[in-house]
A protein has these predicted regions:
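Extended, low-polarity transmembrane helix blocks
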Residues: 2-37, 79-139
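Short hydrophobic/aromatic segments of transmembrane alpha-helices and their interfaces
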Residues: 32, 46, 66-68, 116
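Core segments of alpha-helical transmembrane spans in multipass integral membrane proteins
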Residues: 37, 58-76, 91-92
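Short juxtamembrane and helix-loop transition motifs at transmembrane-helix boundaries
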Residues: 43-55, 70-81
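Charged, amphipathic alpha-helical interaction segments
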Residues: 44, 58, 97-100
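Structural signature of hydrophobic alpha-helical transmembrane segments
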Residues: 52-66, 111-116
Length: 139
């Protein structure tokens, strides 16, 4: 192998890594933004949260723990050292959302598919930038 070939392969590999990292930040940023808005809307107890609570008989305070738990999970996910734990917590939160949507038959298909897609994107963004997550899939 010539020096030129080796240099080209190294440059291509570095460019691919850079592109994957950029894509991972875009995916994680968009998902994080959506989840942050969801968390804040629960914490501010916006009208849609109040309407949902009233429709299904949930207590008025119900949206606050949801906003707090999602906010904590999101913060843990955004810290690189604890990102995997955050992804697990967010997946659990979204799994609960799926279960509630199916149980209450409220947006059972759209709501569940959307929550599932969010969970997949959380892990996909993490997989692109974290070798620990890649190692889980390659063993």
């Amino acid at each position: 192998m010539s020096t030129t070939t080796f240099a080209t392969e190294t440059t291509t590999t570095a460019t691919t890594r850079s592109t994957k990292r950029t894509v991972s930040y875009v995916i994680s940023g968009l998902v994080g933004l959506f989840l942050a808005v969801d968390s804040i809307s629960h914490l501010l107890n916006v009208q849609t949260a109040q309407d949902w609570n009233e429709k299904y008989g949930a207590p008025e305070w119900f949206s606050y723990p949801l906003g707090i738990s999602l906010g904590i999970a999101l913060i843990v996910h955004l810290i690189p050292r604890t990102a995997v734990l955050g992804a697990v917590l967010i997946t659990g939160y979204l799994g609960g959302a799926i279960a509630v949507n199916i149980y209450l038959d409220d947006q059972a298909v759209f709501g569940s598919v959307f929550a599932f897609a969010m969970a997949v994107l959380v892990w996909r963004g993490l997989w692109l930038r974290d070798d620990r997550v890649k190692a889980l899939y390659t063993r």
